[in-house]
Amino acid sequence: MSATGLRRLGFIVAAFVLQTARVRAALPGPDEAPARPSLAGQLLVAAPWMGDPRFERAVILIVKHGPGGAIGIVINKPIGEQPLASFFNALGQKNGDVTGNVRVFSGGPVQPELGFVVHSPDYRRPETVAITDRLSMTSSIAILRDIGDKRGPAKVLLAFGYAGWGPDQLEQEIEERAWGIAEADPTLVFDEDRDNVWDVAWKRRTQNSYLEIPKVRIEGSGLQQILSRP
């Protein structure tokens, strides 16, 4: 890897460490609840007529949705594979017996230096966030070491960057039919061939209108904010 690549990788890994603190600080208290139906834990599926080329055929797992806006991770835009050891080498850390590669995804156009690991719920750290009862997310360099040491979750999706919407922006885009809504089936999130994810998700969409979303609390939708910005 080039010197430039190592510097960028080091910056990305450092962002993992910073992100851990941000995720924990952003968690709501036990009495907080969404004021309206939340899409947290569901999939956004870009309509075939999506006008934004950044989201053409994109499938996005929504991890936060509330009055302040929404945050999601694109799950079907792989950008390559990276040796797990390189994340630690870039920071000058001992990588021990960490072996193997991890597939890396572009999670969205916002802050691509930030890393997120979406994973199955069989793994948990203090900073882990439950998106649903079948999907979790951890933003910590420690999870990469555990994956390399064969102590990590059974299913993993590592993404850098995210998609973000301001207040009422996502609702408006859904009303304009830019997005369909589908269940976040873990098989679709982790196992389906990435070239097929959009086709399968589009066929499975259950709502095309925000107004059609059942007014029930979705598991994990109490997450009011994943990121805090200065």
Give the residues covered by each predicted segment:
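Bacterial N-terminal signal peptides that target proteins for export
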Residues: 1-10
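Bacterial N-terminal signal peptides
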Residues: 10-19
